[in-house]
Amino acid sequence: MAECPNCSCCPEEKGPFDPLLRPDYADRFGPTTRDCIRLADTALRIKIEDDWSGGPGRSGNEMVFGGGKVIRESMGQSVVPRDPGKGKTDTSAGGTAVVPPDTVITGVVVLDHWGIVKTDVALRDGNIVALGKAYNPETMNPLHDGGVAHNGIGPRPTDFVIGPDTEVIAGKGRILTAGGIDTHVHFICPDQIDEALAAGVTTLIGGGTGPAEGSTATTVTPGAWHINRTFEALDAFPVNIGLLGKGATMSTESMLDQVDAGVIGFKVHEDWGATPAVIDKCLQVCQKTGVQLALHADSLNEAGFVQDTLDAIKNRSIHVFHVEGAGGGHAPDMIKMVSEPNVLPASTNPTRPLTVNTVKEHFDMVMVCHHLNPAVPEDLAFADSRIRPSTMAAEDILHDLGAISIMSSDAQAMGRIGEMIMRTWQTAHVMKVRRGFLEEDQPADKPKGTKAEGQTPVDETPEPEPPLADNRRARRYVAKYTINPALAQGIDAVVGSVETGKLADLVLWEPKFFGVKPHMVIKGGQIAYAQVGDANASIPTPQPVLPRPMWGATGLAPGSISYNFVTERAIKKNPSKGRTLNKRFKAITDTRGVFKEHMKENNATPDVRIDADTYEVIIGGAKVTDVTTFVEGQIVDRAYVSELPMAQRYFLF
């Protein structure tokens, strides 16, 4: 944590006790407004924009649990039971409804697409029900009257009551994000789920039936029989599931049958055939049923080029996988699709960020995943055509510009399910080092404490500027694996952000381990995974401390805290019929009206052009090659990174 010099947590007037200085306040209650937190060992740091749970102007009665602390009977804990009766309100607290939560996360720093605030978080019935200040109306006054939406787009601070039925999770000094959403998962091996949860991913969307050739190449669970068996297989895991059906067909009947069986969308993949006719036919079914189409386009350009694919799409919404092209797609200019307003572009993590090893590992990955024969020259040429360092270098910059909206893994099929979040933040770090602060994170032109030119300064000594931070960049990158994939798949009303009314799929991070190893993964309000020590130890902390499944990952709990996402059409046909499942089904919202403009912090559509001979990439007048990057005419060296944060020092054991 970095200390900001020009404000304190207590009033300037001294009372019977000396006011707390910022370091002292942080030691007791965690960082507060205007304090900065470094993310892992990266060059990124975030600044707390507001403190709804205390801090400047609100200090006193911060909720802390423990011996001699606040959350005790007749202090921070009220006598109000969990269900005090319908219609009861606490009139002494300004009409605030007295409905204590099941769990409160105290004094945690929330990092989400809408902003960065410190807050208490209330969870009830598996959902987020309030962000703001936990208190006891019998002994404390409320701090908030509803306020305004944070940054005009986020939640409003709310006061809520801690009761005797409330559990406490300490958020002091920690960061809270929404659970990760991976839209590109090949369901090959059950162990993938543990890897995903241990990395902070709580929603998996994709397809597969195991290590079959069709599944190692394509994220498809084809046909009702396989869909039923896959739902049954995934029922025991505390993750939300969305299955992709096979869209590479001209059979409308087949696709509708798969929707009725429970798919969340379709995958059109070149290995099954990604012709313009197939794309158009699948999108017709998508328009009828409201589901999304995920596209792995035609690398060989057999049935047409990238413009032919765009013509077949006809300005309809589409989720384009690994838009850079190494994972598959029109060679060499697939990446130009980021310019289209109807395309929701995504990356897969093997190309994130471009390093000295990125190109070297891709050839073998392509050969294995797509069942290619090294003895066949045409197969070798196919693999080689997909590996272009110039477009990988451009992908770095397009992420930082907000032109690529989504990050995903491509799990076990040219991607690593446990590294989606980590590689997102590694990319953000590389861009921070190379490009500096985003314009949105730069200070105002005029120093604080002065008026316009020609007028008398307000103060001869300008107020010190707070240190710069990477808030907008952090908000941009966290959105790539939370809210934006949720929007693309029609599940944003349920998951994807830390907002009231949504499922409590949350990840708690120690700042030093941010993006690498979650401290705790909360799934549907219950702790499902956490860093815990030896089970035979006398306390939870002795080594080896490992990410381990918790009670939310055992017994029947996963079915109560997770969803299978399907269409409203499927729910009307009773998806539980003929299946023995504990996990509930949840209807998605229609995805057909979701376009690039709806992607949070990542809706840029710069003009992108690729030289067909040299593979040189031009981004809005900037030139990108595999050696040197030109952004707005300024040369930026070292496109290949030789050292990254969030890497070996975190994985010695």
Feature annotation, model-predicted:
Residues 178-189, 293-300:
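Histidine-centered catalytic micro-motifs
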Residues 234, 238-242, 294, 434-439, ...:
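Flexible, glycine/charged-enriched surface loops at secondary-structure junctions
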Residues 111, 186-188, 246-250, 272-273, ...:
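Short beta->alpha connector loops
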Residues 1-151, 158, 197, 202-203, ...:
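Active-site microenvironment of metallo-dependent hydrolases
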Residues 98-104, 165, 174, 181:
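A short, charged/proline- and glycine-enriched loop
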Residues 2-94, 133, 145-177, 193-278, ...:
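Divalent-metal coordination cores built from histidine and acidic residues
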